[in-house]
Amino acid sequence: MKLYCLSGHPTLPCNVLKFKSTTIMLDCGLDMTSTLNFLPLPLVQSPRLSNLPGWSLKDGNAFLDKELKECSGHVFVDSVPEFCLPETELIDLSTVDVILISNYHCMMALPYITEHTGFTGTVYATEPTMQIGRLLMEELVNFIERVPKAQSASLWKNKDIQRLLPSPLKDAVEVSTWRRCYTMQEVNSALSKIQLVGYSQKIELFGAVQVTPLSSGYALGSSNWIIQSHYEKVSYVSGSSLLTTHPQPMDQASLKNSDVLILTGLTQIPTANPDGMVGEFCSNLALTVRNGGNVLVPCYPSGVIYDLLECLYQYIDSAGLSNIPFYFISPVANSSLEFSQIFAEWLCHNKQSKVYLPEPPFPHAELIQTNKLKHYRSIHGDFSNDFRQPCVLFTGHPSLRFGDVVHFMELWGKSSLNTIIFTEPDFSYLEALAPYQPLAMKCIYCPIDTRLNFIQVSKLLKEVQPLHVVCPEQYTQPPPAQAHRMDLMIDCQPPAMSYRRAEVLALPFKRRYEKIEIMPELADSLVPMEIKPGISLATVSAVLHTKDNKHVLQPPPKPTQPTSSKKRKRVNEDIPDCKVLKPLLSGSIPVEQFVQTLEKHGFSDIKVEDTAKGHIVLLQEAETLIQIEEDSTHIICDNDETLRVRLRDLVLRFLQKF
């Protein structure tokens, strides 16, 4: 069993597991932190960004200053943002049989995999994962395509040039794998390969293994996966949460008795309490709008935004914010808000029960009905007419490199009355803000990450007790910025096995058993013989038939009778010849009794010699030797087949036949 690690980002995993002749890809996350090296894509022409000075090497490379721009001491690539793809050279991705998706954040690289690697398999995901994943991809494509940029930068990627660039460009990894965004045509083609599954549904893969999705408690439709054969079990835990938010709670019991547990997608902010962050978010939001400022919340169109809107629903009246407009701008805003209300079966029990009252599971439906929350596809059209300040605005993208958020950063960034509140943990807020410096608006960092922290992981591992734990190397050591915090790493026995990007891990357990079925008529023919009190044995002579990784013992074909006809058989009528099977023998030969038997049958001049492994019986008159050992008996005589058969029959009297 081998694990191929194709991604270096622990919360955006992409691994390939080879198990029992099947090749299974576990997630295909897309590392978007690479976009932080690029200049933002403004919806409206930005004189500030257009007039940034070019950056070039000291040798005065004239072409480089067209690709690189400098802003407040940072250097950025002036080109369409590119994304860091999973490894495509470590393993032939056309050999991947299936892709298992754990949540909608971990499928953003799917079109790159399914459309450009020769992949012909099936993708398995829950319905909310597929539908919300579609929304995230559609939003991403829309953000990139609506701001066409003619310039494409590639000179800076040359290894000899890159090493001379300032950080973080100098330290950017795998820049040769960075690619532009896919198209909607590729998105639709990739999604057409998805087969929808439900929690606890068992899916057979080629008769070799069975895969089962379990609720992971993190997002709508998010899953952990069990991959098991009859005698081995692998658990894949990715993006899980024990907190009570809107999804179904995490299924922990099904993870027990795992031979290997692959652990990814832990919280990116292990020292931040999500509840505390939500409280800080609300208080900073209220403080800003009371002072006449606007609040900008960069976010994804699904996930944490549902919980934030629910908290604000309970908070706005008590905080005196009833008259403050809330705006949600995204090309998929309407679809996202509607989807959250119709996936009732994937919600926690409290929200499920509201559906039957009937009430909407999420309170943002009421916020929309009362006009406290308005949603728009973009800043153009209706939004321009309805827009009033001060306001609270939710929009994408959290990287601040594309989307409507770029426009509002340019619009509001010069006033200290305004505040930007970061709630998504995927991007460094300091790096996200770098191309907008100098910035007057206030910045609040309230990362809300409900995924498992290290304390919860330690408790989980003690409860489910896997034989082996496998995880990214980042989880086996404290974070670089907090090297003294030994509690911010996985602590388990035996120690976790770690992996890094482009590494192949041989997992430390070997298959020992295989399940074989036996045909009823063959079972009927077995005659067990008691060899010890309470222990019976029966020999099985059969044909092993294997198809689709299922093994069946069938009765052997009867020996074919020779026919005088010389007529040729058709190929498909050929049956393998079956020789008459010799019985298996067991037992031991008592030498003294055997010698007496030989004498009774006319043999004389018998001599017995002891050897290291047994005895040798010499028949001197017949010039024959019988070698008796613990696990074999040999009759050695000189070209006298009649004598050999007589002696064989006498030996067989002392042995049991099966």
UniProtKB/Swiss-Prot annotation:
Keyword Nucleus attached: yes
S-S pairs: none
Domain of life of the native organism: Eukaryota
Record localization: Nucleus; Cytoplasm
Keywords: Cytoplasm, Isopeptide bond, Nucleus, Ubl conjugation
Coiled-coil spans in chain: none
Summary of the function given for this chain in its UniProt record: Component of the integrator complex, a multiprotein complex that terminates RNA polymerase II (Pol II) transcription in the promoter-proximal region of genes.
Protein name: Integrator complex subunit 9
Organism of provenance: Mus musculus
Taxonomic lineage of the native organism: Eukaryota, Metazoa, Chordata, Craniata, Vertebrata
Gene this chain is encoded by: Ints9
